[in-house]
């Protein structure tokens, strides 16, 4: 049977259940085309008719811990919401959304690992920042275009195109164009002046080859729920899909996203407890330039809390190709090329005297004809990335029950970090949100001809990865063996064009420095950005860092009885040091972080109940943290030892009655640091041995109930998050909280060809007061917190034609 016919068969006899979500595109909850093709072949061999879906739980067959959701469940959430919020009910996942609508950012943890140690992929291509591996939740694909999402808990797939996935992977897959011509539009309105429109047009099958395509666009705006400012987001997407014979296909997709956001001001735990959370200022009055040479000195105030200075603009986009070709009756090739573009910063401002020593000679910053003033300027940290990659596989069918796959991944990212300064205009906005970057704005040029900038450095990251995987069934198909190994070879070529005090503080100047030691460190005269003549800086330099490791993974599953399966998995992963770990005053070379993950799990799958439970243990080696160097008065990156993460998690879906489905998940995670942190000279330490990781809730639980009757559907869901520590010594913690959400949908009577529905969503229905994302404190220092969003109500009208 061809994979195309298999898909048709599954679609024809798919279980009529379901409630949170019926998935009929493919049963391969995988990332790349190669992984998908290998797993589709496995399912055809096994004779499965499509995954069972009960109460949101999708029945998994992989020999590892994995959870998935699909579009039918995603559609019950607020349309346009970030995809990471949609997976928040899954076991082991904790996503803290900065607002109710998904465009203000957020943070995610997975089985005890933070977002910089989790790989996020879109159609198999890596989306993490190429420098610090951060995940930007507000830049993800419009939710209407996501077919399914798969979470590998603590492991990767054998061809995962990443050198930074110690904690697991999250991959979401784009929807295919429809076979019939049509259009869809979504109109939304809600609290905080939320407005959104989404439109999609499908060509249907056109031309002599039956090519299908779609184009979509979305626009969303809302006010911040706390303080002045707002969110403005625009996104455009498209896909062309060409089905060939024998299950072969070619596809080309693109995504472009723009965000223009103001930040919500963070708070301390004390401010939260006393209900005194501050907000950013709505006004800032600064003196105007006199326009007279030799006039009076104007002194700008810093306006550090002015909301228009605290912005987070981003332009991001990618082009993604996918293809699968049958080379013979036993051999298949897949090729997935990609290109990505990122331009973003987090705002910033500073005040310079026009006679500042950093300039060498006085410079007229505000154009008033003199150099007597103190002028506030826009001072961003801008990141610009150009990234190309390809993931490819050759899959050879050894027999009807086994195959072997060879995979190769290449990922090349040019990661440019700059900070070209520009003035503010009369309204208090920067003349360009991206500063003087390239052709966006006019940078401030100093008297010596150089550009005034906050930092200036380049990282060129190259990943070459080879992998092999063997997949087979034995003993009347009861035993599944999945064995593989991947070998990533990762290299960073790094150049810093400025002087560096620590990883966060660069000093870009043409001043003549004073050498102070044999290590090549230098000092400068006091200036606005160099507050002490004793501060030491490393000189501009270029250097290379290389990392490689052979990473095995093994998975076994055995059908011990009808509808019951036991599985076990072992996997090793790596997370190479981030750019922030490498740019420093002195050359540093921390070893890559590594993990060893063990899972033992049980699955029960029938027509009415689908469930899974797993016990896991993860050893996290060579953890990189920034510890204090007392001699130089700065923090350096270094390896500080091991962390043990252990726990149990599970989920169950149950359909007790027609139209009623129930879902529940729970996670219990313990984390323990095995070492103390060095803290300066003479053996001083921060006593972290035996302490828990920050930001990680020990206990989480989720529930959801959904009921469908006639043209109505009703949903209620809750997520409980336990206490989370907010400093290294565990002396401060954010309190536990529970959020309840609800959704109601009514299918309107059809008028002509139009099919419409109204949907009401309520987020944080009980208006819980809580703290979201945590920026943890070092030692016993207090952390800072993102205030949780209040109750939000959204009404959505969907129409398809």
Regions found by a protein language model. Give the residues of each.
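N-terminal periplasmic "start-of-domain" segments of outer-membrane beta-barrel proteins
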Residues: 42-78, 107, 149-151
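Short strand-turn segments of transmembrane beta-barrel domains in outer membranes
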Residues: 168-205, 215-227, 717
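A beta-strand signature from Gram-negative outer-membrane beta-barrel systems
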Residues: 140-186
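Acidic/polar loop-and-plug regions of large Gram-negative outer-membrane beta-barrel proteins
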Residues: 224, 241-243, 249-324, 341, ...
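Structural signature of Gram-negative outer-membrane beta-barrels, strongest in the C-terminal barrel
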Residues: 385-387, 395-413, 426, 436, ...
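Gram-negative outer-membrane beta-barrel transporters
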Residues: 476, 563, 610, 617-619, ...
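C-terminal beta-signal and adjacent terminal beta-strands/loops
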Residues: 2-4, 719-726, 746-801
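Extracytoplasmic beta-strand/coil segments of soluble accessory domains associated
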Residues: 46, 82-126, 147, 154
């Amino acid at each position: 049977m061809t994979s195309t016919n298999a898909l048709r068969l599954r679609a024809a006899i798919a279980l009529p259940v379901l409630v949170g979500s019926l998935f009929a595109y493919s049963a391969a909850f995988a990332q790349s085309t190669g992984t998908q093709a290998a797993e589709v072949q496995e399912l055809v061999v096994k004779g499965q008719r499509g995954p069972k879906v009960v109460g949101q739980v999708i029945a998994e067959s992989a020999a590892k811990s994995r959870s998935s959701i699909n579009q039918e469940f995603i559609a019950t959430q607020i349309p346009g919401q970030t995809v990471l919020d949609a997976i928040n009910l899954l076991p082991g996942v904790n996503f803290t959304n900065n607002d109710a609508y998904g465009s203000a950012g957020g943070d995610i943890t997975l089985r005890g690992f933070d977002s910089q140690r989790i790989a996020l992929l879109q159609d198999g291509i890596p989306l993490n920042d190429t420098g610090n591996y951060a995940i930007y939740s507000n830049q993800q694909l419009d939710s209407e275009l996501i077919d399914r999402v798969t979470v590998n808990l603590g492991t990767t797939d054998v061809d995962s195109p990443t050198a930074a996935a110690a904690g697991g992977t999250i991959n979401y897959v784009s929807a295919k164009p429809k076979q019939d011509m049509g259009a869809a539009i979504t109109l939304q309105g809600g609290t905080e002046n939320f407005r959104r429109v989404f439109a999609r047009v499908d060509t249907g099958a056109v031309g002599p080859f039956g090519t299908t395509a779609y184009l979509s666009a979305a626009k969303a705006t809302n006010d911040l729920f706390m303080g002045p400012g707002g969110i403005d987001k625009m996104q455009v997407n498209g896909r062309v899909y060409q089905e060939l014979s024998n299950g072969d296909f070619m596809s080309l997709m693109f995504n472009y996203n723009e965000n223009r956001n103001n930040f919500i001001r963070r708070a301390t735990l004390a401010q939260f407890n006393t209900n005194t959370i501050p907000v950013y200022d709505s006004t800032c009055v600064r003196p105007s330039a006199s326009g007279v040479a030799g006039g009076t000195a104007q002194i700008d105030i810093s306006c550090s809390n002015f909301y228009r200075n605290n912005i987070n603009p981003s332009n991001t986009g990618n082009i993604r190709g996918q293809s699968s070709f049958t080379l013979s009756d036993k051999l298949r090739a897949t090729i997935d090329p990609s290109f990505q573009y990122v331009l973003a910063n987090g705002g910033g401002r500073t005040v310079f005297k026009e006679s500042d020593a950093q300039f060498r000679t006085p410079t007229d910053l505000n154009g008033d004809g003199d150099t007597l003033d103190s002028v506030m300027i826009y001072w961003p940290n801008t990141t610009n990335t150009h990234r190309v990659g390809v993931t490819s596989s050759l899959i050879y069918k050894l027999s009807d029950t086994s195959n072997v796959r060879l995979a190769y991944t290449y990922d090349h990212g040019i990661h440019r970090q700059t900070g070209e300064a520009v003035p503010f205009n009369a309204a208090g906005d920067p003349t360009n949100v991206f500063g003087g970057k390239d052709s966006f704005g006019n940078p401030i040029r100093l008297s010596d001809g150089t550009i005034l900038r906050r930092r200036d450095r380049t990282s060129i990251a190259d990943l070459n990865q080879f992998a092999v995987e063997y997949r087979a069934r034995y003993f009347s198909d009861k035993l599944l063996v999945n064995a593989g190994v991947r070998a990533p070879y990762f290299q960073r070529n790094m150049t810093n064009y400025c002087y560096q005090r620590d990883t966060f503080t660069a000093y870009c100047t043409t001043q003549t420095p004073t050498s102070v030691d044999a290590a090549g460190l230098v000092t400068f005269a006091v200036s606005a950005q160099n507050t002490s003549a004793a501060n030491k800086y490393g000189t501009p330099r270029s250097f290379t860092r290389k990392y490689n490791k052979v990473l095995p993974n093994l998975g076994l599953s055995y059908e011990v009885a009808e509808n019951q399966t036991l599985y076990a998995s072992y996997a090793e992963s790596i997370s190479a040091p981030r750019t922030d770990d490498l740019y420093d005053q002195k050359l540093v070379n921390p070893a890559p972080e590594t993990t060893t993950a063990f899972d033992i799990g049980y699955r029960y799958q029938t027509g009415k109940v689908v469930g899974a439970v797993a016990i896991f243990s993860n050893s996290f080696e060579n953890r990189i943290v920034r510890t204090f160097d007392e001699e130089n008065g700065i923090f350096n990156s270094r390896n500080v030892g091991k962390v043990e993460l252990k726990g149990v998690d599970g989920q169950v879906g149950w359909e007790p009655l027609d139209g009623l489905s129930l879902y529940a998940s729970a996670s219990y995670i313990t984390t323990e640091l095995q070492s103390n942190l060095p803290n300066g000279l003479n053996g001083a330490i921060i006593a972290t041995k035996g302490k828990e990781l920050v930001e990680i809730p020990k206990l989480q639980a989720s529930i959801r109930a959904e009921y469908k009757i006639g043209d109505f559907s009703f949903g209620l869901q809750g997520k409980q998050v336990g206490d989370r520590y907010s400093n290294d010594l565990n002396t401060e913690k954010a309190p536990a909280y529970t959020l309840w959400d609800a959704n109601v949908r009514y299918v309107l009577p059809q008028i002509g060809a139009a099919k419409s529905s109204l949907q009401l969503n309520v987020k944080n229905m009980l208006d819980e007061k809580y703290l979201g994302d945590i920026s943890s404190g070092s030692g016993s220092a207090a952390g800072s917190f993102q205030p949780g969003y209040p109750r939000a109500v959204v009404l959505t009208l969907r129409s398809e034609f």
